[in-house]
Amino acid sequence: MEAKAILRTARISPQKARLVADQVRGLSAERAVNLLKFSDKKAAHLIKKVVESAIANAENNQGADVDELKVKTIMVDEGPSLKRFMARAKGRGTRILKRTSHITVIVGAAK
């Protein structure tokens, strides 16, 4: 039994979000939420919300016990980039990419 939650186009670069995702992959759901709660990173707040949503999906849709859930899979994929322009010297311009992420969390019963 598995439950899934997805956050699309989160305004954080995938590289930064993957640093936090690697810390909680494979942990029990309760421990993952606790670890994310005390992290200072912006990605930790976003990932915590997705993990809590996946836990709620498992609890409400499948009647799973929260104590037995574990973070089976957590993926951070690249979303669409927002293109911005920054003026530079001599009339030139530089393109700035504001990157976004798709965060997917799958929780399931620990075996």
Swiss-Prot record:
Region forming the signal peptide: none
GO BP terms: translation
GO CC aspect terms: cytosolic large ribosomal subunit
UniProt cross-references to Pfam families, sorted A to Z: Ribosomal_L22
GO molecular function: rRNA binding; structural constituent of ribosome
Keywords for this protein: Ribonucleoprotein, Ribosomal protein, RNA-binding, rRNA-binding
Gene3D superfamilies: Ribosomal protein L22/L17 (3.90.470.10)
Assembly and interaction partners: Part of the 50S ribosomal subunit.
Record family assignment: Belongs to the universal ribosomal protein uL22 family.
PANTHER family, per database record: CHLOROPLAST 50S RIBOSOMAL PROTEIN L22-RELATED, LARGE RIBOSOMAL SUBUNIT PROTEIN UL22M
Function recorded in the entry: This protein binds specifically to 23S rRNA; its binding is stimulated by other ribosomal proteins, e.g. L4, L17, and L20. It is important during the early stages of 50S assembly. It makes multiple contacts with different domains of the 23S rRNA in the assembled 50S subunit and ribosome. The globular domain of the protein is located near the polypeptide exit tunnel on the outside of the subunit, while an extended beta-hairpin is found that lines the wall of the exit tunnel in the center of the 70S ribosome.
Name of the featured protein: Large ribosomal subunit protein uL22
Taxonomic classification: Bacteria, Pseudomonadati, Pseudomonadota, Gammaproteobacteria, Lysobacterales
